[in-house]
Swiss-Prot record:
Main location: nucleus
Single GO molecular function: nucleic acid binding
Swiss-Prot/TrEMBL keywords: Nucleus
Organism: Schizosaccharomyces pombe (strain 972 / ATCC 24843) (Fission yeast)
Stored Pfam families: DEDDh_C
GO cellular component: nucleolus; nucleus
Keyword Nucleus on entry: yes
Cellular compartment(s): Nucleus, Nucleolus
PANTHER family, per the entry: GOOD FOR FULL DBP5 ACTIVITY PROTEIN 2
InterPro entries membership: Gfd2/YDR514C-like, Gfd2/YDR514C-like_C, RNaseH-like_sf, RNaseH_sf
Official protein name in the record: Uncharacterized nucleolar protein C2C4.08
Domain of life: Eukaryota
Gene3D superfamilies the UniProt entry points to: Ribonuclease H-like superfamily/Ribonuclease H (3.30.420.10)
C-alpha cells in the first residue's frame, strides 16, 4: 500500500468510526453534512447582514443631513470589451439639490450594445444626453470627486469603482462609499422579513421590490437616477430605532 492509498484508508476509517460511534446510517451522515452546510450559510448571511446594517445606518444619516453631498454613478461598457466605457450616468446632490446627467463618450459613439445587453444609449429619460470626449469626462468626474463631504453611491458599487479605475480615476480615500445592494439587504430583512445569502440583487429586481417604476434601464443616466431613487426610498423608511 502506497502513501496515497494509506491516507485514503485512514480518512475512510475515520469516517466509518464516526458513523459507527454515533450509529448513523450513510443517509443520516449525508443529512448531517447538509445541515452543517445550511447552518454555515445562515451564519454567513447573518455576518453580511451586520455589515449591511452598518452601511444602511451611514446612508440613513447622510441622506437626512443636507450638508452631505452625493455622487450616484453608473457606467455602461461595450459588451465585447469591458475596458471601453461608452456611457456614464451621474446623479448628484450638491448643497441639497439633486441633478441628473447622462454622458456619452464621443470616442466610442460607433460602438453599440444590443446582443447581450439592451442598447438604451439614446433613451435618457431625465434630460438631454451630453456627448463629451473621454478626456473631458475624466476631467468632469475628477472635479466632482473633490467635492467635500462626498458620498459615492452605486448599485454593485465595486463594479463602478472598477470602471472608474479603467478610466484612470482613483476614488479619494476621504470619499464615503455606499452600495445600494447592501442597503437593500438590510431593508429586505427589516421590512420584507427576508434574509438573503447574497447581496447581488439586480437593479431591476430591487426597483420592483421598492415599487419604483423604471424605464430604459441599461442607460447609464437612467440607472444612476433610479439608484438614487432607491436609496432615498429606503432611507426614508428607516428610523433610528431600526438600528
Amino acid at each position: 500500500m502506497n502513501r496515497l492509498q494509506a491516507k485514503k484508508a485512514v480518512n475512510v476509517s475515520r469516517h466509518e468510526q464516526k458513523r459507527i460511534r454515533y450509529k448513523l446510517t450513510p443517509e443520516e451522515v449525508k443529512a448531517e453534512r447538509k445541515e452543517r452546510k445550511r447552518r454555515a450559510a445562515i451564519q454567513r448571511a447573518e455576518k453580511k447582514l451586520i455589515r449591511a446594517k452598518g452601511e444602511a445606518l451611514v446612508a440613513f444619516q447622510a441622506v437626512s443631513n443636507p450638508s452631505c453631498n452625493f455622487l450616484v454613478i453608473d457606467f455602461e461598457a461595450y459588451e465585447f470589451n469591458q475596458k471601453i466605457i461608452t456611457e456614464a450616468g451621474i446623479t448628484m446632490r450638491i448643497n441639497g439639490e439633486w441633478d441628473y446627467h447622462h454622458y456619452r463618450i464621443k470616442n466610442f459613439l460607433h460602438l453599440r450594445n444590443g446582443r447581450f445587453v439592451p442598447d438604451e444609449a439614446d433613451n435618457f429619460q431625465f434630460g438631454d444626453s451630453k456627448i463629451v470626449t473621454k478626456i473631458a469626462f475624466i476631467s468632469i468626474l475628477k472635479k466632482i470627486l473633490k467635492t467635500p463631504n462626498l458620498h459615492l453611491v452605486g448599485h454593485g458599487v465595486e463594479n463602478e469603482i472598477k470602471y472608474a479605475n479603467v478610466l484612470g480615476i482613483p476614488i479619494p480615500k476621504d470619499v464615503t462609499v455606499l452600495d445600494t445592494q447592501n442597503v437593500f439587504s438590510f431593508f429586505q430583512s427589516l421590512f420584507l422579513k427576508e434574509i438573503s445569502n447574497s447581496n447581488n440583487i439586480s437593479l431591476a429586481k430591487m426597483l420592483t421590490h421598492l415599487n419604483i417604476r423604471a424605464f430604459c434601464l441599461h442607460n447609464a443616466g437612467n440607472d444612476a437616477r433610479y439608484t438614487s431613487e432607491a436609496l432615498r426610498e429606503m432611507t426614508n423608511k428607516f428610523t433610528l430605532s431600526n438600528f
